[in-house]
Amino acid sequence: MSLRGEIKLNSFDLMGVRIDPLTMDETVQTVEKFVLDQRPLHLMGVNADKINQCQTDESIKKIVNDSEIINADGASVVLAARYLGYSVPERVAGIDLMQELLHLANEKGYSVYFFGAKEEVLNDMLTIFKKDYPSLRVVGHRNGYFSAEEEEAIQEDIREKNPDFVFVGITSPKKEYLIQKFMDNGVNSVFMGVGGSFDVLSGHIKRAPLWMQHAHLEWLFRVANEPRRLFKRYFVGNATFIKRVLDEKRKSKK
């Protein structure tokens, strides 16, 4: 279900991927419309890695472009879009958006379901949330380690509990495929893939200091803390992304 014709998003195409240049506040307001109307929503955030994936995987590209809202999550996407002449008001980082939606749910009484990460991480995050969001209605939670045979049971648990928000903290592209599957099977919630945000919000992994976030260097902090897992993704992946951006710029000048 697209927002076209309902809300003017001024979307643009970045290397075959639709970007909706919304601010954080506009995103939260738009998401709440879906909650109030009880309509399903796949809330997508794209960074350089996701755009790189879309260049080589048509199935993930379709899931991304079919999402109702697509935010510019990564700083590299914001900078690349502006370099190519598109207007992007700000970066809407997934972890920040998740926290804004939790504040909304805490204030308005919307229900939430957390799916992902290790059991210890999940429990520590929920303990913190009891203090930070005392009125938050957590109707269910489930760790992110499961077999293919367990997917249907997870889907039915979410369907039965009927949360307004489902935050999915598992790796990409697995989370995108799973969210799409649940939505195709009629689970009527706002789904947001949040990657490793549970690890950060539980205190198990530190987030970059604000000055690094503002300087668009959060990726460097993450690589320094998890070099084995993230070196290839950021250094090789970012180099590939930059080359593609430069190629796009050259094409636009012809």
Regions found by a protein language model. Give the residues of each.
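Short glycine-rich anion-binding loops that position phosphate/pyrophosphate groups of nucleotides
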Residues: 47-51, 170-175, 197-198
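N-terminal nucleotide/polyanion-binding subdomain common to many enzyme families
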Residues: 2-90, 95
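Short Gly/Thr/Asp-enriched flexible loops that form oxyanion-binding sites at enzyme active sites
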Residues: 126, 176-185
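Proline-aspartate-enriched helix->loop->beta-strand connector
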Residues: 158-167, 172
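A short helix->loop->beta-strand "cap" motif at the edges of active sites that frequently abuts
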Residues: 40, 110, 187-189
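Short, flexible loop segments at boundaries between secondary-structure elements
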Residues: 143-149, 187-225
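Conserved beta-alpha
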Residues: 81-157, 161
